[in-house]
Amino acid sequence: MTPRQRLTVLATGLGIFMVFVDVNIVNVALPSIQKVFHTGEQGLQWAVAGYSLGMAAVLMSCALLGDRYGRRRSFVFGVTLFVVSSIVCVLPVSLAVFTVARVIQGLGAAFISVLSLALLSHSFPNPRMKARAISNWMAIGMVGAASAPALGGLMVDGLGWRSVFLVNVPLGAIVWLLTLVGVDESQDPEPTQLDWVGQLTLIPAVALIAYTIIEAPRFDRQSAGFVAALLLAAGVLLWLFVRHEHRAAFPLVDLKLFAEPLYRSVLIVYFVVMSCFFGTLMVITQHFQNVRDLSPLHAGLMMLPVPAGFGVASLLAGRAVNKWGPQLPVLTCLAAMFIGLAIFAISMDHAHPVALVGLTIFGAGAGGCATPLLHLGMTKVDDGRAGMAAGMLNLQRSLGGIFGVAFLGTIVAAWLGAALPNTMADEIPDPIARAIVVDVIVDSANPHAHAAFIGPGHRITAAQEDEIVLAADAVFVSGIKLALGGAAVLLTGAFVLGWTRFPRTPAS
């Protein structure tokens, strides 16, 4: 690599590091944020979900703006938006202001995510060098994602909850400076007109889909009509979008990309990998904090094998693609994710050292998958459509992360709701008291959350506490194992698709 190429990798890598860290780091600060804004669980969840929703809604628009007005200029704009909104997040004005700031932060994250990959692709036209560059970029970013719980726990314990947002200010300044000094500007050589109709149909469609996925765990049978209406509206908007894109002279998304079976397969497998990665991180963090009752810092430290494995595998994946082609690394790493989940599920309730080995293998599998998939996705398009291709890949990551958290979380919640009432029948004979405790535990995803209902004036006595916790812990462990099994099913489908679609030949 030339010195300028190294600066490009560093600048874009640190940018995506900020984005991935903020996906998860705020979870550690939620108890403190809850006290400041005096809000309940639903308000907190939307404060978190606003980031992902804002990011998912505008990814493709960011790609088009970057291709037209300059990818470096748009990247710098995204970094600036991200830093300014991070500052607003620490102002104790109201929960509404905090949530809006998180949405705007997601908008900035969308610019950073899409344009960092597009800038990287432009700076490395050679496929072999591009594979190495993407592997380094992905390693930096995903280490941020997986290390966020530990980093957040350390910062919240030592500096307070505002530090998880204020850290973006100096980091953003470094990214801003490195980009202006070391990254070349690039854009579509034949800039197109802005596809306003495409944006006005795609953005609300993606927002509705993301909203439905985020809210899915809270919907009940009475909400079926509302859910159907949301999905119908999203479907109509997508139909209008596709119809318009077929006719548009300058489309937001070139639908010819999807005519290539390989590109479609890359998007699907990448969606599955990101779903399983982010969904599993959420479930495992929940296990360490809520079931094992570890502190945020201790739980974060237990998660460190995931970024360690991810980072090492990401760095090696580029060389593996150049030597063996994309199929073997992807299939091997999908199998590693499956095996890592199996090891963790078997040992999670009694053998922590073995469970940590499973997390390391899982992280390595995810890191080794991401680089070949991004390499395949970016090499299938010409440089003029690099922003568009990067936007589609980042959209899969964003929606995949939302879907994975909702999918695995729904499995755990459904299992708890079905199994806890029968399991606690002996500990809490009174059906009314039992229903109250079950609702509290399921809503908070915490077997210890029933403590507020124990004591004078309540139907549950303090003597029942140990039995309730033991029973709830056992059901939680079973639910988490079931959720990990759901992730394994998704990985199996991705493995079959990769086996049949991905090329075996190395990059030339």
UniProtKB/Swiss-Prot annotation:
Pfam families: MFS_1
The keyword Metal-binding belongs to this UniProt entry's keyword annotation: no
UniProt-listed GO biological process terms: response to antibiotic
Keywords, sorted A to Z: Antibiotic resistance, Cell inner membrane, Cell membrane, Membrane, Transmembrane, Transmembrane helix, Transport
Topology relative to the membrane: Multi-pass membrane protein
Superkingdom as given in the UniProt entry: Bacteria
Activity modulation notes: Efflux activity is inhibited by carbonyl cyanide m-chlorophenylhydrazone (CCCP) and verapamil.
One example GO MF annotation: transmembrane transporter activity
Any one GO CC term of the record: membrane
Gene3D superfamilies: MFS general substrate transporter like domains, Multidrug resistance protein D
PROSITE patterns (UniProt xref): MFS
Induction behaviour: Induced in the presence of ethambutol or isoniazid.
Entries under CDD domains matching the protein: MFS_MMR_MDR_like (cd17321)
Transmembrane segments annotated in the record for this chain: 9-29, 46-66, 75-95, 104-124, 136-156, 163-183, 194-214, 222-242, 265-285, 297-317, 328-348, 354-374, 399-419, 479-499
Location in or out of the cell: Cell inner membrane
Similarity comment text for this entry: Belongs to the major facilitator superfamily.
PANTHER family hit by this protein: MAJOR FACILITATOR SUPERFAMILY MULTIDRUG TRANSPORTER MFSC (PTHR42718:SF9)
Primary role: Involved in resistance to ethambutol and isoniazid.
Name the UniProt record assigns to this protein: Drug efflux pump JefA
Source organism (scientific name): Mycobacterium tuberculosis (strain ATCC 25618 / H37Rv)
Gene that encodes the chain: jefA
